[in-house]
């Protein structure tokens, strides 16, 4: 499903690189339990068997072939992976329905972006695979509340919370970009409660959240928050709210992530 190869580095070689720690620390497991998508509440990806539908929606089948479809599973749908064989995986949904999906239709890759550490961490389930230095918003200490501007630089903030990659942009002005689903439904409710956006704007954002589609980006809450390239590699604060990594690191993230990849920003 992912077609981009990182130069001469194969995904197999990357997967064999040692994690930051040979064993997953308790702290990493605690973080993993908070790495959730909109649809994945508590167990999150700390469970080695918990995956999610990635890239695009997929069909759940009764048998490990495409002859007996059961239902369509949307992107970000959490599933428990039971076993895999011959490019098919047996999975169980949250409501207990069991069936088969193509092995390439699910993933357990997720991202944690730490404003305090100025780092981006990439995990596969509970395993920390890679750490990247990252640049964050001009105001590195506060959560995002509204759109920033040259006259409101304090509001150039990186939003905190649970997001997912809603779009991948290979032609970004910042090399490549993973667009996050900010503002989320919770951002919209808070913005409406605080008088920042209108009722219709709130409802449009909530509707997009429910459809698992790109939310409106033109309200006073701001938008187009991305993990993108052209970062300094020096862990500074200069963006208007995005997370910037070097282009080399962006290539790595681009290879491993898909639409639906969970992103925890804290």
Language-model regions: role of each:
Residues 13-15:
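Boundary at the C-terminal end of the N-terminal hydrophobic targeting segment
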Residues 62-68, 149-150, 248-250:
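Short alpha-helix capping/helix-loop boundary micro-motifs
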Residues 67-72, 154-155, 253-254:
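Short, surface-exposed secondary-structure edge patches
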Residues 17, 22-24, 29-39, 156-160, ...:
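Exported/periplasmic cell-wall-interacting domains
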Residues 128, 133-160:
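Electropositive
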Residues 24-39, 66-104:
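SH3/SH3-like beta-barrel superfamily modules
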Residues 1-9:
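Bacterial N-terminal signal peptides
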Residues 103-140:
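A structural motif detector for short, solvent-exposed N-terminal "entry" segments of globular domains
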